[in-house]
Curated annotation (Swiss-Prot):
Transmembrane feature ranges: none
InterPro entries from the UniProt entry: KOW, Rib_uL2_dom2, Ribosomal_eS4, Ribosomal_eS4_central_region, Ribosomal_eS4_central_sf, Ribosomal_eS4_KOW, S4_RNA-bd_sf
Gene Ontology terms for molecular function: rRNA binding; structural constituent of ribosome
One Pfam match: Ribosomal_S4e
S4 RNA-binding domain boundaries: 38-99
Protein's name according to its UniProt entry: Small ribosomal subunit protein eS4
Record-linked CDD domains: KOW_RPS4
């Protein structure tokens, strides 16, 4: 298994100085896709500036000072991605996108402490007639709820992933754009155009633009809106 790559070849979504080092570690498979995740080593060293040497970051991890979504993580190659909560020495950070499509790590608003939004990517029926839901971060959940649809966002408590609310992929709801020319923007769904072909459904916004449904991450309804860091919500 290839554990590192030349930093010039690292995923373009990483917001790092590409001339500062020669090598960059690769994210482990299993959570977010490689091109949409930040290995913890890079997150702690290059983003949060908690150490300059790999051994300094390894020491922080070994001492159980780092959590992802409320669970202690010691693996330096563990990848974190959009909507993950990174906790270091009690301080919470949220992984998001800036207006250039780069992954950023910003202080997490206090009102969202202990909460996470998960976008539904797929559903399958399992034994007993229950439903297994797969999410954007690679995680899954088995539930009896049949009202949860693809494209919806599920608000959960972390780390146990107890469902708090379901934000529907529907007109009138607020969304965060995760790709395309409007990446990093927050908008409101005006209408959803269902394609009869194999092409992606189009989502039209009140703000006057449209994008494919896979770039739309529901973050708010008339009753609740998940607060994003100020630098992203502007």
């Amino acid at each position: 298994m290839i554990t590192k790559t030349k930093i010039m070849m690292a995923p373009r979504k990483l917001k790092i100085a590409r001339k500062s080092r020669f090598w960059a570690v690769n994210s482990l498979p299993g959570s977010h896709k490689k091109d949409s995740s930040i290995p913890l080593l890079i997150a702690l060293r290059d983003y949060l500036k908690l150490g300059d040497k790999e051994r300094e970051i390894t020491r922080i991890l070994t001492n159980s000072l780092v959590m992802v979504d409320g669970k202690v993580v010691k693996e330096r190659r563990r990848g974190i991605g959009f909507m993950d909560t990174l906790t270091v020495s009690g301080n919470d950070y949220l992984v998001s996108y800036d207006r250039k499509g780069k992954l950023v790590i910003l202080p997490k608003p206090g009102e969202t402490k202990g909460l996470k939004l998960l976008r539904v990517k797929g559903k399958t029926y399992v034994k007993g007639g229950r439903i297994q839901i797969s999410f954007h971060d690679g995680s899954t959940m088995v539930t009896d709820r049949k009202d949860i649809k693809n494209g919806d966002s599920v608000l959960v408590k972390i780390p146990k992933k107890e469902i708090v609310d379901v934000l529907k992929f529907a007109p009138g709801n607020r969304v965060f754009i995760t790709g395309g020319s409007h990446v990093g923007e927050i908008a409101t769904i005006k209408s959803i155009e269902i394609k009869s072909s194999s092409g992606e459904n189009m989502v039209h916004m009140n703000e006057g633009f449209s994008t494919v449904s896979s770039y739309v991450f529901v973050m708010g309804s008339p009753k609740y809106t998940f607060s994003m860091p100020e630098a992203i919500a502007e």
